[in-house]
Amino acid sequence: LSSDQIAAIETADIKHLTSGQVAAMTSDQVQALTTDQVAAMEALDLRAMTSVNVSKLGTDQIQALTTAQVANMTTAQIQALTTDQVTAMDTANVTALTTAQTMALTNGQMAALTSDQLQALTTLQISTLKATQIAALTSEQISAIETADIKALTAVQAAALGSDQVAALTTSQIAAL
């Protein structure tokens, strides 16, 4: 199907695509999907999309993803997201990330998270981050993390904080460590 034909598929009909059909889509076809079509895709069908094609989704398409779709993405799909795509994620979708998905975020993706997205991470998500992911956060990001989440940092995670990050901690965050 051409990009125009893909874009012309009724939103209600997108649900009828099989996982195999989604997996076989070209990058051009994926980019032609409307935001309504993306939002209407079954979570398991989106999971079948290749990581390369996930990286080709526009930021508006990323914003259209549902929490169920995000929670069902593979760790390879999560790692394929560009930093612009990560920044575009709705905070509810950041909260929907599984611990495996959160742990799969690259250091570049971690550095791309907005303050609101970091605040949306759950204590469990924060507590399972790798030390390298913590070290990748900017000072501004560190200061945006909720005090309860700072308290959940492991000794290894806390030791990964750089001097600039430690300097950015608030008094309540320091007390929580």
Annotate each language-model stretch with its function.
Residues 1-177:
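General marker for long, soluble alpha-helical cores
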